[in-house]
């Protein structure tokens, strides 16, 4: 028995030494890492924020916690936030110009980020494009969705549609914060919430979790993207995605049976044609009588790389 106990004791000591040595090795290896290291902390909250020129004070605990939640999520959603900053360099100049022309606050460019991360994505509900329009809403605004064309993917036209829709919501609700909420949940649902709860504004109403978060998500994205370095994001200008503005417009008034052949004739690849014109949804472009389309064609494909 004594032999067994002594053997177990020796084994325990050896295992302890082995474990200690491995721990030291691990700590040493970590300290020598040259990869990204993080300091995880909370995020600073301002006393107030503005959305569309409307002041949102953080003097209520509910508002502070909702804002902090979105700041934390977006500040530490590293890959997505980096891509937001990079893609903004490509798309914001066009979006800002159209917002200004339509008297929509520039802050609403961040709504596009909240909706789609500035990508021509499709939601689980079927909303599409950077501004995430549903097909019925978009068609009602006299924009085209067909087998060959979906203007929800057209940056300029979808942004114009967004401005028309946002201004319509502002005329109805009289507040840009409410506009953001109504854009998310739908104007009919939002108006119903206000009426049923005798609420005068967005901050007094209890809506779905998604809509409770939505304006604060826009605010958080705005806060981080306006001051990325404050949140630890250091993206050199040369690393941002360049605007796709090196093109000429080609007017098309007759059907193109094969867009790949059209692209080749213009000296570009089919892929490049689709990058510059994501609203082209098939390999053909049917042009009805009296219809006209403008295709963006880069001057030289080599210059667009």
Language model segments and positions:
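An acidic, Gly/Ser/Thr/Pro-rich helix-cap/linker signature
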Residues: 3-103
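Solvent-exposed, acidic/flexible segments
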Residues: 77, 81-92, 101-104, 123-131, ...
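Short, functionally critical alpha-helical segments immediately adjacent to catalytic or ligand/cofactor-binding
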Residues: 104-119, 179-184, 273-276
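Substrate-binding/active-site groove segments that recognize
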Residues: 126-147, 161, 166, 190-193
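Catalytic and binding regions of secreted/periplasmic enzymes and modules that target cell-wall glycans
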Residues: 166-193
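Primarily a LysM-type cell-wall glycan-binding module
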Residues: 238-267
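LysM (lysin motif) carbohydrate-binding repeats in extracellular/periplasmic proteins that recognize
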Residues: 259-287
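Extracellular LysM carbohydrate-binding repeats and other cell-envelope/extracellular binding modules
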Residues: 276-305
